[in-house]
Curated annotation (Swiss-Prot):
Pfam families assigned to the protein according to its UniProt record, in alphabetical order: PCMT
Entry protein name: Protein-L-isoaspartate(D-aspartate) O-methyltransferase
Active site: 60
Source taxonomy: Eukaryota, Metazoa, Ecdysozoa, Arthropoda, Hexapoda
Organism: Drosophila melanogaster (Fruit fly)
Residues that coordinate or bind S-adenosyl-L-homocysteine: 57-60, 65, 89, 115-116, 147-148, 222
GO CC terms in record: cytoplasm; cytosol
Family: Belongs to the methyltransferase superfamily. L-isoaspartyl/D-aspartyl protein methyltransferase family.
Enzyme Commission code: 2.1.1.77
Length: 226
């Protein structure tokens, strides 16, 4: 993509993403500045490209994390419930936490990262604690092990849901866990085929509207047996 680049450090990377119009809001830029990718990506943390993090999983490119924050930012408010499916390294989950915390403190806020690989769950918690132990200690950011394709009913309904891997078709179970006024963004399409980042918005009456945002290429949303 035209904006792909390598930052000298985390702040330089965020500056470049902002200069190229990938990051539009100061609040998104600040959340990403405060969440240094070096804690979450052992290889090339400031390169704008996916990087391996173990278990056959990659951390998404920084520009895709920026897009996710921009598309969801109006739903990231104190007291909101957020679900990050396929949370992997824990990076974007931490960005959600910091974005909301900067808006104000509310005891009802819950940001849940769900990951199906036990080792990645362990590693992401270690990443978060290396970054800032107070995030997990707050009880408002949770990392859980489970099949994210089924969402996480204990904290539903969610004001915002992000999915970090491609669903083969419309993710009905996740849509069912959206709150009224909530938004889901998810890559949809077959592995190796045409995929699109799709946005699902649920209105006050439960009606869902889908908007196709852009063409993407993601690994498929799976479980350990896939």
């Amino acid at each position: 993509m035209a904006w792909r680049s390598v930052g000298a450090n985390n702040e330089d990377l965020i500056r470049q993403l902002k200069d190229h119009g990938v990051i539009a809001s100061d609040a998104v830029a600040q959340a990403m500045k405060e969440t240094d990718r070096k804690h979450y990506s052992p290889r090339n943390p400031y390169m704008d490209a996916p990087q391996p993090i173990g278990g056959g999983v990659t951390i998404s490119a920084p520009h895709m994390h920026a897009f996710a924050l921009e598309y969801l930012r109006d739903h990231l408010k104190p007291g909101a419930r957020i679900l990050d499916v396929g949370s992997g390294s824990g990076y974007l989950t931490a960005c959600f936490y910091r974005y909301i915390k900067a808006k104000g403190v509310d005891a009802d806020t819950r940001i849940v990262g769900i990951e199906h690989q036990a080792e990645l769950v362990r590693r992401s918690k270690a990443n978060l604690n290396t970054d800032d132990r107070s995030m997990l200690d707050s009880g408002q950011l949770l990392i859980v092990e489970g099949d994210g394709r089924k969402g996480y009913p204990p904290n539903a309904p969610y004001n915002a849901i992000h999915v970090g891997a491609a669903a083969p078709d419309t993710p009905t179970e996740l849509i069912n866990q959206l709150a009224s006024g909530g938004r889901l963004i998810v890559p949809v399409g077959p592995d190796g085929g045409s995929q699109y980042m799709q946005q699902y918005d649920k209105d006050a009456n439960g009606k869902v509207e889908m908007t196709r945002l852009m063409g993407v290429m993601y690994v498929p949303l799976t479980d350990l047996r896939s």
